[in-house]
Amino acid sequence: MRTIAVLTSGGDAPGMNAAIRAVVRTGLEKGLKVMGIQRGYNGLINGEIFEMDTHSVSDIIQRGGTILRTARCEEFRTEQGREKAAKILKAFGIDGLVVIGGDGSFHGAQLLSKLGINTVGLPGTIDNDLAYTDYTIGFDTSINTVLDAINKLRDTSTSHERVSVVEVMGRNCGDIALYTGVAGGAESIIIPEKEYNADKLCKQILQGKLKGKMHNLVLLAEGVGGANELAKYIEEVTGIETRSTILGHIQRGGSPTCMDRILASRMAYKAVELLISGKSSRVVGIKNGKIIDMDIDEALAVERSFDQELYDIATILSK
C-alpha cells in the first residue's frame, strides 16, 4: 500500500472535514501518498484527483460541509461508469480508497471492491440510518442544531400559546426527531417507525391545554412528512393557533460538535490502518464506545433495531 485516496459522497454531514483531515495526516504519518478526489464519484469518473499534504487539511476540523465537495453521479450507477472509475484509480496508482458517506456511497464502494479496488467506508450522514453502527458522523451536530432551533421555537410558541409543528430530516430513520424530542421536551414525536393518528394527537393537545400547558411542540420526521398540512388540521380540530416550521438543510451545516470531531478522527484513523493491513471491502463504525470494522456486505445487510426504550421514555416524559 503506497497511495490512498479519500472522497466524500452523497449528502454532506458535519465532521466530514475532520475525517478527511485524519485520513490525510494518518496516511502521511504512515509513509503513504494521499490523494483527494473532488465531488465524490462524479469527480472520480472525471479524474478530479489531486495530491494532498498536511497543509491541505489545515484549519478545516472546525468547518462544516466538506472541502472535497460532494455530488450525485448517474454515470457511476452504470457498469461502464464504475469500470471507468476503477481504471482511473489504477491510472493514478491509487491502492486504497476511503469513502465517506451514507448507504448509497457504501453501495458504490461495495461495487468498486468487486472490481479489485481496496475500499473502506466511513459513515457520514446526519440521519444516523446505518444500522451496523451506533452513531454516524454528523448526527450529533445535527441534533444539537435541531435542539437549538426548537428551544427558540418554544420561546415564541409559549408567548403566543400556540402549537408548533417542526419537521426535521430523516426519511426512513426517525432518530433526529426522537433524540431531539426527548432532549427538547417535545409533547409529540412522529416518526416513520411508529404509526400515528392525527385525531388522537389533537385530543392529546386539547388535554394538555386543559392541564394548563402553555404550548405544544410536535416533532415530525420528513419520512412521515406533511408538516404544513398537519398544522392546518390541528388548528381546525382544536381551535388552537398552530404554526409549522420545516428546518431543512440548516440541519446539515454548522461547525461539528466535539463528539463528531472525535468520532470522525477515530474512524478515519482506523480506516487507514485497515488499508495498510491489507483489509478491503470494510466499513468502520462505533459500538458501545469502541471503534469497530466489518465486511461491507454484512454491514449493509444489518437490519435496524428501533430504540423502543427511548421512545417509551419520550412518551412518559411528554405527559
UniProtKB/Swiss-Prot annotation:
The main place the protein resides is: cytoplasm
Which reaction(s) are listed as its catalytic activity? beta-D-fructose 6-phosphate + ATP = beta-D-fructose 1,6-bisphosphate + ADP + H(+)
Location comes to: Cytoplasm
Q: What regulates the activity here? A: Allosterically activated by ADP and other diphosphonucleosides, and allosterically inhibited by phosphoenolpyruvate.
GO cellular component terms listed in the entry, alphabetical order: 6-phosphofructokinase complex
EC number(s) recorded for this UniProt protein: 2.7.1.11
Q: In which pathway does it act?
A: Carbohydrate degradation; glycolysis; D-glyceraldehyde 3-phosphate and glycerone phosphate from D-glucose: step 3/4
Q: Which HAMAP family match?
A: Phosphofructokinase_I_B1
* Name of the protein in question: ATP-dependent 6-phosphofructokinase
The species this protein was found in: Clostridium botulinum (strain ATCC 19397 / Type A)
